[in-house]
UniProtKB/Swiss-Prot annotation:
<keyword id="KW-0687">Ribonucleoprotein</keyword>
<dbReference type="Pfam" id="PF01783">
    <property type="entry name" value="Ribosomal_L32p"/>
</dbReference>
<dbReference type="GO" id="GO:0015934">
    <property type="term" value="C:large ribosomal subunit"/>
</dbReference>
<dbReference type="InterPro" id="IPR011332">
    <property type="entry name" value="Ribosomal_zn-bd"/>
</dbReference>
<dbReference type="GO" id="GO:0003735">
    <property type="term" value="F:structural constituent of ribosome"/>
</dbReference>
<dbReference type="GO" id="GO:0006412">
    <property type="term" value="P:translation"/>
</dbReference>
<dbReference type="InterPro" id="IPR002677">
    <property type="entry name" value="Ribosomal_bL32"/>
</dbReference>
<comment type="similarity">
    <text>Belongs to the bacterial ribosomal protein bL32 family.</text>
</comment>
<protein>
    <recommendedName>
        <fullName>Large ribosomal subunit protein bL32</fullName>
    </recommendedName>
</protein>
<keyword id="KW-0689">Ribosomal protein</keyword>
<dbReference type="InterPro" id="IPR044957">
    <property type="entry name" value="Ribosomal_bL32_bact"/>
</dbReference>
């Protein structure tokens, strides 16, 4: 089994772990049908439209 040859320094360890604090929030866009915020390239959960046509039936 592999064993580290040298001890990992605090700086190297912290650099590797630093990405967790920089994760970006998901991009939200306005639905052209109902003007609610939705995820990009996804069906709108509020009205069920995607690219100008109804993709799913939404119970109201």
């Amino acid at each position: 089994m592999g064993v580290p040859k040298r001890r990992t320094s605090k700086a190297r360890k912290n650099k590797r772990r630093s990405i967790w604090g920089q994760m970006a929030a998901p991009t939200l866009v306005e639905c052209p049908q109902c003007h609610q915020l939705k995820l990009n390239h996804r069906v709108c959960p509020k009205c069920g439209y995607y690219k100008g046509r109804e993709a799913i039936q939404v119970a109201e």
